[in-house]
Amino acid sequence: MEFDTIAAISTALGEGAIAIVRVSGDDAVEKVNRIFKGKDLTEVPSHTIHYGHIVDLDTNQVIEEVMVSIMRAPRTFTRENIVEINCHGGLVSVNKVLQLILAQGVRLAEPGEFTKRAFLNGRIDLSQAEAVMDLIRAKTDRAMNVAINQMEGRLSKLIGRLRQDILETLAHVEVNIDYPEYDDVEEMTHNILIEKATHVRAEIAKILETSKQGKILREGIATAIIGRPNVGKSSLLNSLVQEKKAIVTDIAGTTRDVIEEYVNVRGVPLKLIDTAGIRETEDVVERIGVERSKEMMSQADLVLVVVNYSETLTNEDEELFRAVQGKDFIVIVNKTDLPQAIDMERVIELAAGNRVITTSLIEEQGIDELEKAIADLFFEGTIDSADVTYVSNARHIGLLTQAGKTIGDAIEAIENGVPIDMVQIDLTRTWEILGEITGDTVHESLIDQLFSQFCLGK
């Protein structure tokens, strides 16, 4: 497959030590060589790096002092010739280098176009390409490991084996239908077909079992911190983040808006949402914050309900407990450094089997126990991202769910005595749906849409 030559800045814009301009295409080396003063880049070996200068051909002025990496096809990310120009960081110089390259007839790359070419040229499949963006966006080491495993093709291999099983079954059915007189081919009975289809459905279900945890590692747990004013919600946020993000005072109603922050809790990314204290108030601004707090609470995956150890439970406290019933929540009884006034038996009763943890955030007590409780709640205490193939992408989860339903329809049809040749339709559709995960059967418009979400230069 032939493409034109493209270029883009591959590093984040702004001041920094190094900025990289990436160029990919059949004549990438020749185009860069025109503006490079140093060794003749067309003569140097692949996978080598060379010192020199970028020159403006119109003025013969030296623009940048650079190191240029030469990587020749097919042993490159895009399977095309790639040149990477390492220049000084900053906005002006790197943009000037890019403009000089574009002036040589090179096109500015679209977002994700380098990765798209890697996919279209067969270096990676679609699930591996999507994992590139997951790696860039990973917020914890665990999330990074999941993305790397997918980039290395773990999910692709699982899907490939399932598609191969279905294909072999379809081929067997075809032979039985078209050549019934062949005695050397085993007859595809309804029982054999059910066995093979049931195996595929079980494998799909097994992959989907990891989807909840995989999605958490990829996107994080949306965690709302709720409670009455001045019970320690902002202190809890600061303790988990380990820096002061929220204002902490003795004045009730200090937090009037929603504060969001990502934090790594034992390998699990938490999207912490510190909400305004929930209470009846005449303050218009605070009342808006309270309404937003209730909205965030309803949308959260996990709710941390904070109550005050040194005060008796109020009607507002009990209303919060009723509001979180049916959700995953943990109760934090804070301020244990003060004399006890709260009825702990009533707290445990209201928690309805959910964890209750006592803390003194001012003395930094109880945070480790809270972090363990969160990991236990979502991962049963262990996250084995090294050995488990997590499916975390919403598109993949949707397609696997759809494939599971379609193969289920095939099994139901077989059990109801539908002719085997009619069952082929559901088997073929399952094979096609699974192929959409790896990009083998995906529509071109979807490919364009997926890669448009990538950052420029990737």
Curated annotation (Swiss-Prot):
SUPFAM superfamilies: P-loop containing nucleoside triphosphate hydrolases (SSF52540), TrmE connector domain (SSF116878)
Residues the record lists as binding GTP: 230-235, 249-255, 274-277
Domain TrmE-type G: 220-379
Tree of life domain: Bacteria
CDD domains referenced in this protein's UniProt entry, alphabetically: trmE (cd04164), TrmE_N (cd14858)
Gene Ontology biological process: tRNA methylation; tRNA wobble uridine modification
Function of the protein: Exhibits a very high intrinsic GTPase hydrolysis rate. Involved in the addition of a carboxymethylaminomethyl (cmnm) group at the wobble position (U34) of certain tRNAs, forming tRNA-cmnm(5)s(2)U34.
Quaternary structure annotation from Swiss-Prot or TrEMBL: Homodimer. Heterotetramer of two MnmE and two MnmG subunits.
Family, as annotated: Belongs to the TRAFAC class TrmE-Era-EngA-EngB-Septin-like GTPase superfamily. TrmE GTPase family.
Stated name of the protein: tRNA modification GTPase MnmE
Record gene name: mnmE
